[in-house]
């Protein structure tokens, strides 16, 4: 047994309702309306689940819900999620800065990768989820002297970095690294 065992997993659901005796729903043309309602219901559950992953589960009063002494505060706030400071008091790299050199961004990516692999013993292949600002900056050419690959291409060559993907829940200099290998 580990001290971090257990996570509260709420059930996410949504629904839609049609009056089954309504004659319109006894015709084939009603299938499109029912399919649209089902799609809307599924999208609602997906939005709630993504919010739960990033921001945790709160009760109606806005407090984190607790069950059997367990709670989930989301990737941003939970104590069981490793947080690495990218600011001046940490790794000191701003992946969104257009003035940062490609070499500095690559060095910052190596430091971040090593923090996860060496310090936290995370040896699975990493998938990096980054903000839109970071993804835009990583699409710059690595060298201005000749148009070779992008900064993202260079980071993807690093051992252990399998993919870099954009996530709309992230903003600014936020990165979520998930071992998916």
What are these regions (language model features)?
Residues 45, 49, 109-119, 155, ...:
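Hydrophobic, Leu/Ile/Phe/Ala-enriched alpha-helical segments that form helix-helix packing faces
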Residues 19-21, 130-134, 179:
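Helix N-cap / beta->alpha transition motif
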Residues 37-40, 108-115, 151:
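Short, hydrophobic/aromatic alpha-helical segments in well-folded domains
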Residues 49, 53, 117, 121-124, ...:
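Residue-level signal for secondary-structure boundary elements
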Residues 13-107:
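Alpha-helical scaffold segments that mediate packing/assembly in large oligomeric complexes
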Residues 1-14:
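Assembly/oligomerization interface modules of large self-assembling protein complexes
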Residues 87, 136-181:
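Sequence/fold signature of self-assembling virion shell proteins
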Residues 56-59, 66, 100-141:
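Structured, hydrophobic secondary-structure cores that serve as assembly/anchoring elements
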């Amino acid at each position: 047994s580990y001290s971090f065992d257990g996570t509260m997993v709420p059930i996410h659901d949504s629904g839609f309702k049609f009056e089954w005796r309504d004659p319109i729903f006894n015709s084939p043309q009603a299938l499109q309306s029912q399919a649209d309602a089902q799609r809307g219901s599924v999208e609602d559950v997906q939005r709630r689940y993504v919010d739960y992953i990033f921001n945790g589960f709160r009760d109606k009063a806005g407090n984190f819900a607790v069950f059997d002494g367990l709670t989930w505060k989301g990737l941003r706030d939970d104590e069981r999620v490793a947080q690495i400071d990218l600011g001046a008091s940490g790794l000191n790299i701003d992946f969104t800065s257009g003035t940062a050199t490609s070499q500095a961004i690559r060095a910052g990516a190596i430091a971040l990768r090593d923090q996860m692999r060496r310090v936290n013993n995370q040896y699975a292949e990493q998938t990096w989820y980054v903000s839109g600002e970071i993804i835009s900056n990583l699409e710059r050419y690595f060298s201005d002297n000749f148009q070779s690959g992008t900064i993202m291409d260079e980071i993807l060559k690093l051992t252990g970095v399998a993919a870099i993907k954009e996530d709309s829940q992230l903003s600014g200099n936020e990165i979520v690294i998930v071992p998916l290998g």
